[in-house]
A protein has these predicted regions:
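Serine endopeptidase catalytic core focused on the charge-relay Asp
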Residues: 60-263, 267, 280-283, 291, ...
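Glycine-rich acetyl-CoA-binding "A-motif" of GNAT/NAT acetyltransferases
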Residues: 286
Length: 315
C-alpha cells in the first residue's frame, strides 16, 4: 500500500530505532506468502517495519459511507442534506440510533404540519447529495417539534380556524379574489432542533466521529471554550464559545422563522449542510448540536437538553 520512514514498533509501541516502514493492507504470516513478497529485516543496514493500514480510501462526506459514521451527509427523504451528528443509545430500548437536527431528519416538522411523520425513510447520503430509495438506512423514530412563525404559518386553534372560514367567506363575497387567513400572534419557543432515526436491520454503525475520534462524554459549556466539529460541508473546523443562554430568531424560509432560547453561540465554524454536527471539545466531550448560523456565527443547542428531550444517551 505504501512505504515511508518511521520508528520501528514492537507490540504497537514505537522504539528508538528509525527505519523504513512498509504499509500493507493486512499483515500475513511469512509462511503464507511467496518468498518474493517477504519484507527483509534490514535494507542496506537500515531496519524495516511492517504496519497494517487497511484499505486506504479518500474520505467522502457527501457520498455513500458504510458503516455509518458521524460527520457525513444524511437527511429525510423529502429534504436536502445535513450531517449525521452522533450515534446515541435509546434509553427505552437500548438500541443504537442516529442523531441530527429535526430539520435534517424530520424535515423541520412540528408534528402536525404533514412535513414528516414517524417511520419516514432516512437516506445516507441525503437526497440533495444524490441519495435514493436504495440509500435508505433508517426510519425517523422521534423528534422534538420545531415551531415556526411567519406568513407561512397557519393557526391550529379550532376557534381561530372557524373564525377564519367565516371571515374568508364574507370577504370573498364582498371582494372576489381576496381572502382571510388567521396566524398565531406569537410563535412558540424552541429549545432544541433535534431528532433521532432508528437504523434498519443490518446497517452497521461506527460511533467514531469522522476526523475527530471517539465521543468521550459531555462538557459543561463555558465562555471561551475551544471546540471543533465534523460536518458534511466544511469538514473539520474549530471555533470558540462566545455566548451562553442566547435567545435568537432563525430564518426557516423567505417568509418563516423559528424562535430559539437557551442557545449556544460560537464563532463561525459551519455552512449550510453542516446542520446536525456534534460540537465537541478537543478531548472529545460533546457540548452542542449545530443547528444554524451565518458567516459570522454558529448557533447550537445544548447537547444536554437534546439528549434529555429525546430520551437518549451518547453511545
Amino acid at each position: 500500500m505504501g512505504v515511508g520512514v518511521g520508528y520501528k514498533e514492537v507490540g504497537g509501541e514505537p522504539t528508538a530505532h528509525l527505519g523504513v516502514t512498509v504499509l500493507v493492507r493486512k499483515k500475513v504470516e511469512p509462511h503464507r506468502l511467496p518468498r518474493s513478497h517477504h519484507v527483509p529485516y534490514e535494507l542496506g543496514g537500515v531496519p524495516t517495519d511492517v504496519v497494517e493500514v487497511g484499505d486506504l480510501v479518500l474520505f467522502t462526506r457527501t457520498g455513500r459511507v458504510r458503516p455509518l459514521v458521524p460527520g457525513v451527509s444524511i437527511g429525510h427523504w423529502r429534504g436536502g442534506a445535513g450531517t449525521l451528528g452522533a450515534v446515541v443509545r435509546d434509553k427505552r430500548s437500548g438500541q443504537l440510533m442516529l442523531l441530527s437536527n429535526n430539520h435534517v431528519l424530520a424535515n423541520g416538522t412540528d408534528g402536525r404540519d404533514g412535513r414528516a411523520q414517524r417511520g419516514d425513510p432516512i437516506r445516507q447520503p441525503g437526497t440533495y447529495d444524490g441519495g435514493t430509495e436504495a440509500d435508505t438506512v433508517a426510519h425517523l423514530d422521534r423528534f422534538v417539534p420545531l415551531f415556526r412563525a411567519g406568513a407561512g404559518t397557519r393557526a391550529y386553534c379550532p376557534v381561530a380556524r372557524g373564525v377564519e372560514k367565516i371571515a374568508d367567506r364574507v370577504v370573498s363575497a364582498l371582494r372576489p379574489g381576496y381572502g382571510v387567513h388567521v396566524y398565531p400572534r406569537r410563535s412558540r419557543e424552541n429549545v432544541v432542533d433535534a431528532a433521532v432515526a432508528r437504523p434498519l436491520p443490518g446497517v452497521s454503525l461506527d460511533p467514531t466521529v469522522l476526523e475527530v475520534g471517539q465521543v468521550t462524554g459531555i462538557a459543561e459549556p463555558r465562555i471561551g471554550l475551544e471546540v471543533l466539529k465534523s460536518g458534511r460541508t466544511t469538514g473539520l473546523t474549530r471555533g470558540r464559545l462566545r455566548v451562553l443562554h442566547a435567545a435568537v430568531r432563525v430564518a426557516m424560509s423567505a417568509t418563516e422563522w423559528a424562535f430559539f432560547t437557551e442557545q449556544l453561540v460560537f464563532t463561525a465554524m459551519g455552512l449550510p449542510g453542516d446542520s446536525g454536527s456534534l460540537i465537541l471539545t478537543p478531548e472529545g466531550k460533546a457540548v452542542g448540536l449545530l443547528a444554524a448560523g451565518s458567516d459570522r456565527a454558529t448557533i447550537a443547542c445544548d447537547i444536554r437538553r437534546v439528549l434529555e428531550l429525546l430520551d437518549v444517551e451518547l453511545a
